[in-house]
């Protein structure tokens, strides 16, 4: 079914068939011929926004039955039952002259972390200063983007299959990851420069454990 909305309340229902490669694979390292059922997902979403105050909040819940995923051994698997994922988020942007402070916080709960792993808390921040270098000709943004999430077993990547699998060995999180950036807009041209992980080595915590 297609999405349908009533104001700021939405409902969506999807029924997804497994791909050919999810059911059939023959390679040097992996071989399987696994008939899979269709996934069924029902999702409800509510959203509230106040544009004049640059504020938005919302929540959504999705229930997926017969979820198809790649297990810790990278073999395809199908969950016998339903998994529920609930998310609550808030976004608030502040502006003081040319200073922009954009903030977004997300809370998530999964009823089965081995099937749908998610961090409990995630935060996304973008702080930058915007100003004219040459009025109506060249404009600059200089700032930092930051990301943070609590520890969880983030999916690992298997290059032999080109898929992400649900590993249960290494927890990722409890570490602020920051990028410095400069963006210039000159007439119709945009130039973007980024220095990734600018805070590397500043904290004793390990990013991947």
Which residues does each predicted region cover?
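Exposed, low-structure sequence patches enriched in small/polar residues
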Residues: 1-209
């Amino acid at each position: 079914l297609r999405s349908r909305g009533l104001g700021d309340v939405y409902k969506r229902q999807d029924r997804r068939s497994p791909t050919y490669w999810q059911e059939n694979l023959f390679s040097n390292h992996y071989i399987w011929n696994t008939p899979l059922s269709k996934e069924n997902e029902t999702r409800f979403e509510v959203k509230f926004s106040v544009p004049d105050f640059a504020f938005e909040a919302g929540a959504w819940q999705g229930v997926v039955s017969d979820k198809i995923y790649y297990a810790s051994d990278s073999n395809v698997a199908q969950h016998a039952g339903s998994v529920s994922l609930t998310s609550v988020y808030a976004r608030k942007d502040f502006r003081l002259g040319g200073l922009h402070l954009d903030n977004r916080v997300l809370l998530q709960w999964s009823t089965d972390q081995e099937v749908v792993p998610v961090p409990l808390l995630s935060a996304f921040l973008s702080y930058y200063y915007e100003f004219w270098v040459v009025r109506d000709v060249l404009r600059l943004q200089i700032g930092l983007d930051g990301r943070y999430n609590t520890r969880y077993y983030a999916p690992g990547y298997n290059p032999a299959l080109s898929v992400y699998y649900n590993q249960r060995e290494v927890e990722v999180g409890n570490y602020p990851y920051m990028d410095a950036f400069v963006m210039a807009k000159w007439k119709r041209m945009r130039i973007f420069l980024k220095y990734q992980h600018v805070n590397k080595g500043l904290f004793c915590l390990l990013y991947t454990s």
